[in-house]
């Protein structure tokens, strides 16, 4: 399979996003990456979906890959939602959302709103519905304060690359990838918290079929938080558990 066809997507606030497209099938998947990632890390995922009869479109969310925006920053989580909506408009017809990690929280945040064209189903891989390692209270308090007075301050995200996959080659490639970054900002953190709260409060409004892929050995996103959301979900749902696998299920 060839590499992605690169497209340019303009989000609502005029931020330019790079997107990739694979295949030309009549059925569409909108694929979303995790924090600090880019479309190049999902070529193999897109290839499998194309083989299964799907056309795949994937944006690099603002601040990621070669899209515009500061790394590890968004002024509002809703800006990510707008990035997804702009990509969906490019697709122009009903689609399925497939999302990993941070992309899972962005996907569900998008589904809290009416989408045009509509999303007809969603599949999530270890979504960011909670963090596996809780930050000390003093760090959380500092992040909330800095979000108000210095929201764009770049700080180390403290993500352990060895926790993404059991495959040493995947870890080595991740650590050497020039488009992967290791920073976050206080505003990103508080917007993530707010998005998780909005999801818990509005979950009952999402009714489309949900497929959740969950690793109980995930040391990055909290599998218990994702499982709680799954149990509370009132629409059609299926759950696939992969107990021994690490965070990046698509790279195990």
Where in the sequence are the language-model features?
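Catalytic nucleophile-loop/oxyanion-hole region of alpha/beta-hydrolase
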Residues: 36-39, 65-91
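Conserved alpha/beta-hydrolase
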Residues: 46-69
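Alpha/beta-hydrolase-fold enzymes
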Residues: 102-185
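Short beta-strand/loop motif that positions the catalytic acidic residue
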Residues: 206, 212-214, 218
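Catalytic histidine-centered segment of alpha/beta-hydrolase-like enzymes
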Residues: 245-252
């Amino acid at each position: 399979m060839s590499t992605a066809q690169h497209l340019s997507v303009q989000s609502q606030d005029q931020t330019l996003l790079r997107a990739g497209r694979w295949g030309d099938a009549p059925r569409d998947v909108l694929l979303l990456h995790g924090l600090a990632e880019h479309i190049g890390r999902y070529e193999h995922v897109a290839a499998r979906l194309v083989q299964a009869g799907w056309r795949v479109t994937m944006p690099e969310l603002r601040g990621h890959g070669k899209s515009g925006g500061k790394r590890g920053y968004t002024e509002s989580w809703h800006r990510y939602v707008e990035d997804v909506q702009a990509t969906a408009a490019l697709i122009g017809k009903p689609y399925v959302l497939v999302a990993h990690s941070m992309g899972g929280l962005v996907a569900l945040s998008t589904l809290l709103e009416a989408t045009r064209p509509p999303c007809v189903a969603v599949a999530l891989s270890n979504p960011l519905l909670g963090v596996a390692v809780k930050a000390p209270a003093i760090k959380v308090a500092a992040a909330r304060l800095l979000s108000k007075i210095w929201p764009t301050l770049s700080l180390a995200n403290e993500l352990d690359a060895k926790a993404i996959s059991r495959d040493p080659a995947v870890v080595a490639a991740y650590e050497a990838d020039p488009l992967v970054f290791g920073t976050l900002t206080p505003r990103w953190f508080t917007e993530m918290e707010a998005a998780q709260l909005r999801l818990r409060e509005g979950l009952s409004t999402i009714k489309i079929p949900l497929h959740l892929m969950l690793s109980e050995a995930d040391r990055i996103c909290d599998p218990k938080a994702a499982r709680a959301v799954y149990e509370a979900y009132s629409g059609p749902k299926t759950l696939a558990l992969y107990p021994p696998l690490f965070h990046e299920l698509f790279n195990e």
